[in-house]
């Protein structure tokens, strides 16, 4: 996967326009470490609290399909999500965001309704993460993100804000056009 990230970054592979744009600082640093062979792929991501952009969250969705079709247990899903996220974003806050998102997608792949999928991710075991980290996702895991007003949803590059916005939009719109154009 890290090799493919490098192909994307260096050669614009997998892009719609044959141009790379808006690569985050954390992703850039991680890919540089990997390219210079300074670390194993899963150890290249920064793990400080200031390295919690949404880069790994934006790339993690294919892992949901893999885990679903392999019928993996939650502990194995967390391990894979952690390893893939850690290529660029190794902090537990970003890993948890990716895990929540992957689990939500898996619930949808199982045929659950949006509401049931959302309720099911709130019931998962998050004890592999500190209470402080889990509490950063309080509006998703302990409250109901879909009930917030649009003005209360932030649109930033911070992983928590991005996941909140993603779930809010998905839970509050019915069509693609409504979600994108709003």
Label each PLM-derived region with a short phrase.
Residues 1-182:
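Structured, active/binding-site neighborhoods that engage oxygen-rich ligands
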């Amino acid at each position: 996967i890290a090799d493919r990230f490098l192909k994307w970054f260096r050669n614009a592979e997998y892009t719609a326009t044959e141009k790379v744009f808006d690569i985050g600082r954390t992703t850039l640093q991680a890919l540089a470490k990997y390219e210079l062979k300074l670390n194993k792929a899963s150890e290249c991501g920064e793990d400080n609290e200031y390295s919690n952009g949404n880069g790994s969250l934006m790339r993690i969705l294919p892992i949901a399909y893999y885990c679903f079709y392999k019928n993996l247990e939650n502990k194995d899903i967390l391990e894979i999500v952690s390893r893939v996220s850690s290529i660029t974003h190794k902090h537990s806050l970003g890993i948890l965001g990716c895990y929540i998102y992957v689990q939500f997608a898996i619930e949808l792949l199982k045929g659950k309704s949006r509401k049931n999928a959302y309720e099911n991710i709130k019931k998962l075991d998050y004890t592999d993460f500190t209470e402080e980290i889990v509490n950063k996702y309080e509006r998703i895991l302990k409250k109901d993100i879909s009930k917030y007003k649009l003005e209360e949803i932030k649109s930033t590059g911070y992983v928590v804000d991005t996941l909140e916005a993603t779930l809010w939009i998905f839970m509050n719109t019915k069509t693609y056009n409504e979600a994108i154009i709003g």
